[in-house]
């Protein structure tokens, strides 16, 4: 089964992707990992991508699609794969389909923006240990202090509300059109159209996991 997991940053895709990968015995595939592996292995595609990146350019979609084809032909993808952070744009989704790469199921994790802002802007981190807290969901015993050392907790720049809002804006402009694209594709009934399922990404991690796994098994 080949799966694409869609959702805004902070929707919980990373956590659920691990569960899906384990449940179905399929690898997570990210374009970043693919590019690094191809460059390291010095494959023709990897060398072409490296030349573009070394010149400060963006790797074009046709090269990314070729890398995807190369990757999914490997033995660990025999039972499928889970695409992680790809496709990001409508052009990539269309190129994926034009390239004859069949996708079986699209899962959209739907979480309102204000919930994502609350989740992300409430995170606090103890830098030395990496211990993570949340001011609402997992607060430290003493506000803004690490439970074990008493040292100060910090809010990472990525978690500041202004940054989160910018990332959500970019998601809505670039990636959200994929939701409509795949939903319409699913509804038009063409033979190669993937199934499309929207999951509410609110609830416990276990509840969301169970719903996603049941949906994929359905």
Swiss-Prot record:
SUPFAM superfamilies xrefs: P-loop containing nucleoside triphosphate hydrolases
GO biological process: AMP salvage
Keywords, ordered alphabetically: ATP-binding, Cytoplasm, Kinase, Nucleotide biosynthesis, Nucleotide-binding, Transferase
Gene Ontology cellular component annotations, sorted alphabetically: cytoplasm
Residues that coordinate or bind ATP: 10-15, 123, 132-133, 203
The protein's annotated pathway: Purine metabolism; AMP biosynthesis via salvage pathway; AMP from ADP: step 1/1
Source species, domain of life: Bacteria
Xref: Gene3D superfamilies: P-loop containing nucleotide triphosphate hydrolases
Keyword Kinase assigned: yes
UniProt keyword Cell inner membrane present: no
GO MF entries: adenylate kinase activity; ATP binding
Binding-site residues for AMP, renumbered to this chain: 31, 36, 57-59, 85-88, 92, 156, 167
Predominant cellular place of this UniProt entry's protein: cytoplasm
Disulfide bonds listed in the record: none
CDD domains: ADK
EC number: 2.7.4.3
Domains as described in the record: Consists of three domains, a large central CORE domain and two small peripheral domains, NMPbind and LID, which undergo movements during catalysis. The LID domain closes over the site of phosphoryl transfer upon ATP binding. Assembling and dissambling the active center during each catalytic cycle provides an effective means to prevent ATP hydrolysis.
Biological role: Catalyzes the reversible transfer of the terminal phosphate group between ATP and AMP. Plays an important role in cellular energy homeostasis and in adenine nucleotide metabolism.
Family: Belongs to the adenylate kinase family.
Protein's name in the database: Adenylate kinase
Organism: Chlorobaculum tepidum (strain ATCC 49652 / DSM 12025 / NBRC 103806 / TLS)
Name of encoding gene: adk
